Amino acid sequence: YIGSIRVYESIRGRLSELYDYEYVSMPYRRGERYFFHMNKGLQEHSVFSMADSLGGEITVLVDPNTFEDERRSFAGSSITDDGTLMAWFTSSSGSDWKTVHFTNLETGEVLSDTLFWLKSGVAWNGDNSGVFYTMYDLPEEGEEYTQENRNQKILFHRLGTPQEQDSLVYHRPDMPDWMLYAGMMDDGRHLAIYIYDASVAACNGVFFVDMESADRQVVELLGDFDAAYYLLEAVSGVFYFMTDLDAPRYRVVAVDPSSPSRENWVEIIPESNQLLQWASILGGGSTILAGYTWEGYDSVLRFDLEGNMLGEVELPGRGSVWGFGGELSDTETFFTFSSFLNPGTVYRYSLETDESTLLWQPEIDADLSAYTETMVYYESFDGTRIPMFMLYPEDIELNGSNPVLLVGYGGFGVSNRASFRTSIIPWLEMGGIYALPCIRGGGEYGREWHMAGIRENRPTVFRDFIAAAEFLIDSGYTSPDKMAISGASNGGTLVAAVLNMRPDLFRAAAPTTGVMDMLRFHKFTVGWAWKSEFGDPDDPDDIEFLLGYSPYHNVLEGVEYPSVMISTADHDDRVVPGHSYKYGARLQAAQAGDSPILLRITSRAGHGGSIGLSEALDHAAERYAFYWQELGMEESP
């Protein structure tokens, strides 16, 4: 199919031109060393590196381009606070399963220690003698990519010993659906244990272990599972949390573990009219940096530890920021600033001077001044006002004939933000409009926005997305014959569900790695953890609303469906590929029209990662060629 589309090669070539630029990630500091990723331009994978100073001599730590197996990928790292030891992860064929390796950064020696079958990170203990990590029950041979992953436990691995001797730190066999995460506070004393219960949406518990106590007992600090709690840091024995308890847009509170009842909590930063998205405690505990967002655009405020506002961090413009993290003692931090038309630019921020310094700015081969970035608002079916990002060529005419790519996600409290995406540029150069609505189910307005799109409220997400399409048509941007829709993972589910509901509203659709069978998603790998978001297929009360939108079950014979390109990967062990296989087969069998129903399967790849840049650009070019063909477009990049 793709080979017959004449613009594929030109799109693919243009993508290569756009990605051929030197890339340097936002660095972070551990001890006296700085760590970052680099890419010279068109390297298949970025290279993880370090330097003793900013701008100093670079030492390559992990270069995935040298791995013998091209489907083995670098999957992250964890560096000790003093910058002397590194745990680093590899994954095979894009699987969520990780193998952990260890390197002495003083000598460059790769240690003999290796940890297998992890789906989590690791947390170094206070004296760097070992790491805490979580493990599920080991999968049966032959079922590594499909078997349910349950019964998580926290273990401790001491360097120099085999994994079989790792000691058990915490396990609740009576709670097989608890998901556990371990993190060591910067004080080197308190091990935090985060607990997520699959039956409770957007809530978690926080327990801790005082590693200096004689018995090292697990203390249930916050165990009601009634809100979200993010532990920022322990300062002088007091725990600072960001929480949405009694504050849907989040606040910061201080909890003394010796008297943790709520009447003893101290509110440090109250809830505001904007969404508090993150907070960091730096400067030896003197400063809280708090990141706020509202309708996709960010601001950063400074507070002292008592909650007195010290000022606002000056940002380069209107856009989004990532970063501002670090260790408690740090007096410098780093951030990346980006917007849809402003490529990610890296800055160093000094807490001592309250000034930002430009470190790195990419050079993209495109005239971004030829395009407009804006936010529009539309009414959904129930009168709710929904914001939507839009990107389009400056010379656009509202004549109803513009090609539109409408992209959605709408789930798990994930917020759409104004960030640069290089891969969008060819679409704009082809005369296309890019639209990204902030539909319910996401986190753009906090807890209530998320809760409005879960479980029995899931149809609200789909109707918000349909309302976005209708707005674009009614406003003269486009028409049904010129509209394509796209989404990945939860967004793939959205696209497939909307396609069933309104096949007349779109000309093309590209659902990627979506959950398509809502009655069986919980039977594979970590699918059971999504029951709080989707509903429980084993609960008779939930089956009715799950069946009401399940993409696989709502494909109808005799319907003229638009053109569809379904994408999945054969080693996806998060959303197993069977979802896309069976949905695609059913859609092909039911199609009453002439439009193609295509299934694109990536070999030896997972839900994300593993494939190199060239293959990722192949996939992007295929999708744009598909849209170009099915929407009857004329321009090519």
Where are these regions (language model features)?
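Cap/lid segment of the alpha/beta-hydrolase catalytic domain
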Residues: N65-T80, F89-S95, E109-L111, L351-E355, ...
